[in-house]
Amino acid sequence: MAEAALQTGARANVSRQFYFAMALTCLVIAVLGFMPTYFMPMAQGKFRGPPLVHIHGLVLFAWMAFFCTQTWLVARGKTLAHRTWGVLGVSIATAMVFVVTAIVSWRISQASLPGQPEGLAHGVRAFAWVSIGGLAFFIGAFALAIVEVRRPETHKRLLLLATISLLGAPIARWFLTLLAPSA
């Protein structure tokens, strides 16, 4: 009986560590994805963009940091702190809806201005579906995770899926910047 309880506890700990490792992996993917198009140009003083771009980055990276923190709290057995801070996740997720919608709308309007290279508006609109599609999935999975908050196994899986759905844009940037043919 005691051995079975120990094995169950060990499996639960491995599961908690898995979700923390996955959260860190998502954060690393996001950072690496935006390294060539945002972080490096910012560090070199070459990035030019309106405040909305910085707000967008701040809010979405806030989610990634929040998700890492939440999974770390659970992995350390600090469930009460996890639940207390959980309300902040709803605020960040709500902000994400507005900021992603605003940045996608802004990018499309900028690409559609007269004098832009031919085909740019089409490319930006096509890429917008990556952001909007990821956001739509995030909203659905996040809402279901809130509904399933009393079922930890379902709750954590839905939040991981929601977070993974946000990785389309940073992963696409690997292809757009690192693997794109030379101009």
Question: How would you describe each model-predicted region?
Answer:
Residues M1-A183:
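Alpha-helical membrane insertion/targeting regions
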